[in-house]
Amino acid sequence: IVGGNGCGKSTLAKVMSGVLPIDKGKVSVLGHTPTSPVMARNMGIATVFQEVMVAEEASVVDNLFVGSDDFWWKNFTQREKVLKAQEIMEDLVGEYVDPYTQAFNLSLPIKAWITIARAFLRENTKVLILDESSAALDFDSTERLFKKMRELRDNGVAVFIVTHRIA
C-alpha cells in the first residue's frame, strides 16, 4: 500500500486491524470486518505500526511477551520465554541481544525489532500488516525484515506493507 503523506494508508491499516471504526464503506479481512484489536488478533491479524512501542523500564523478554496471556506461550516457563526471546531477536537482528537488558539501554533499531518481533511470535498469524515498520531500521535491518516477510508469505501469510516510498 503506497501513497503520499495523509492519503489514508495508516488509517486503512488501523481499520484492518480493528483499531479504528469504519465511518463509510466496508472493509473485509478474511471474510470479516474487525471491530476491535482483540477481534483482529483472534482472526489472525498481526499489526506492527511505525511507533516503537516498548516499556523502557522492562527487559527485552518482558517487552516481547507483554500482553501475551492468551497466546500459545502462556504456559511457557520464564526460562522458555528467555530462550524464545534470544532465538527470535538473534534471528531478526542478526546478532545476540541480551534478553535481560532493559529497553532504555537499547538503540532505537533494537527497540523497533522488539516491536516487530511481537508479531513474529504470534502462532496463528494469517495476515501481517506492517505500517511504516521499517522507519527506524537501517538498510541491512530492512533487508532482514523483508527476508522474514518473504518467508511468512511463502508459508501462506498475507503481508501488507504500508509505505510512502518504494525503495
Residues covered by each model-derived region:
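Glycine-rich phosphate-binding loops of nucleotide-dependent enzymes
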Residues: 1-167
